[in-house]
Design a protein with these regions (language model features):
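NAD(P)H-binding glycine-rich loop region in Rossmannoid oxidoreductase-like domains
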Residues: 33-35, 40-91
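Substrate-positioning beta->alpha
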Residues: 159-166, 180-203, 210-214
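Conserved Rossmann-fold NAD(P)-dependent oxidoreductase catalytic core, especially the SDR/UDP-sugar
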Residues: 24-26, 83-130, 147
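Amphipathic terminal alpha-helices
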Residues: 281, 289-305
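Substrate-binding strand-loop-helix patch
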Residues: 158, 186-193, 213-233, 242-250, ...
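Conserved beta-loop-beta element that borders a ligand/cofactor-binding pocket
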Residues: 101, 133-158
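Hydrophobic/small residue at the entry helix of a nucleotide-binding pocket
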Residues: 10
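Terminal hydrophobic/aromatic helix or amphipathic segment near a protein terminus
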Residues: 227-274
Length: 305
């Protein structure tokens, strides 16, 4: 059995992939939501309750942290949830597989590789760093087995993030994309399907344990180029992409929680932000989904909606 905490795009994709492979899956969310499919059990529970989560994880081969607290609640929500996940993994013997991101690296001036150190200094970004450090310390102490997959901004149907919400959801219908940062800066976009495949691989391959891995991700393109290619793939002309000046973004953040939180990660879009996943690809034989395939499916979905 595999236990997944969270039923967002990543948790859902991972559960469906495991179920397709004949595995039994238990998804834990506060409201018991998630995909309805053979082999998938939906459980309503507070995953931050260590005893409850440990009971739900008993006998599991792997425990996947696919939770995604609202960004403005990271400092309050992540610590108890992370502690509960560690307790459940240690108690049950399940491999703890965490869906991570690139926030822990902080601003970078070169592509992020397997060897790039975690150097974030903002308290919210450091939260994710500490989560991994705590899991790694427990792994090295022999208390549990842990690994982590780190992806760039998500791409693909059903995913949330800058590419879909600020660009493709608008441009696929002939509208204008309004984006923060530099719309021409190269950026890595990771397909949700590739995240799921990587998580399942890390859970079942002992070579992955005790390390963090970058999810296979195609070559970077700017958000302007991504929107252009997406439109071309569904037969639309190149869209208009407008930049939101930082002072405007800052001011809008006074009235909108999400925009306010984007100030913290604005650096990821103000300059090239690139992921080099070649090490993961070489070790596990995984390859990223071609970006055009992901863009075409996403744009077609928005066009038809």
């Amino acid at each position: 059995m595999h236990v997944i905490v969270g039923a967002g795009p990543v948790g859902t994709a991972t559960a469906l992939l495991l179920a397709e492979r004949g595995e039994q899956v238990r998804i834990v969310t506060r409201r018991g939501t998630g995909p309805q499919a053979p082999g998938i059990e939906l459980v309503a529970a507070d995953a931050a309750d260590p005893n409850r989560l440990a009971a739900l994880t008993e006998g599991a081969a792997a425990l996947y942290n696919c939770a995604n607290p609202a960004y403005h609640r990271w400092l309050t929500d992540w610590p108890p949830l992370a502690a509960s996940l560690l307790h459940a993994a240690e108690t049950s013997g399940a491999v703890l597989v965490t869906m991570g991101n690139l926030y822990g690296y902080g601003p970078v001036t070169a592509p992020i590789t397997h060897d790039t150190p975690l150097a974030a200094t903002h308290p919210k970004l450091v939260t994710r760093v500490r989560m991994w450090e705590d899991a790694l310390a427990a792994h090295r102490a022999g208390r549990l087995r842990a690994t982590e997959a780190r992806a760039s901004d998500f791409a693909g149907p059903g995913s949330y993030g800058v590419l879909n919400e600020m660009a493709l959801s608008r441009t696929a219908k002939g509208g204008t994309a309004y984006v923060m940062g530099d719309p021409d800066a190269p950026h890595s976009w990771t397909a949700i399907a590739d995240v799921a495949r990587t998580l399942v691989t890390l859970a079942t391959d002992e070579r992955a344990w005790g390390q963090a891995w970058l999810v296979p991700t195609p070559p970077p393109v700017s958000i302007r180029e991504a929107a252009r290619r997406a439109n071309e793939l569904i037969g639309l002309p190149a869209p208009r992409v407008a930049r939101i000046p930082y002072p405007v973004l800052w001011t809008a953040g006074l009235f909108n929680t999400m925009l306010r939180e984007m100030r913290t990660t604005h650096y990821q879009f103000a300059a090239p932000f690139v992921l080099d996943s070649s090490h993961t690809e070489q070790v596990f034989g995984l390859k990223p989904t071609p970006l055009d395939d992901t863009l075409a499916a996403t744009a077609a979905g928005y066009r038809a909606a």
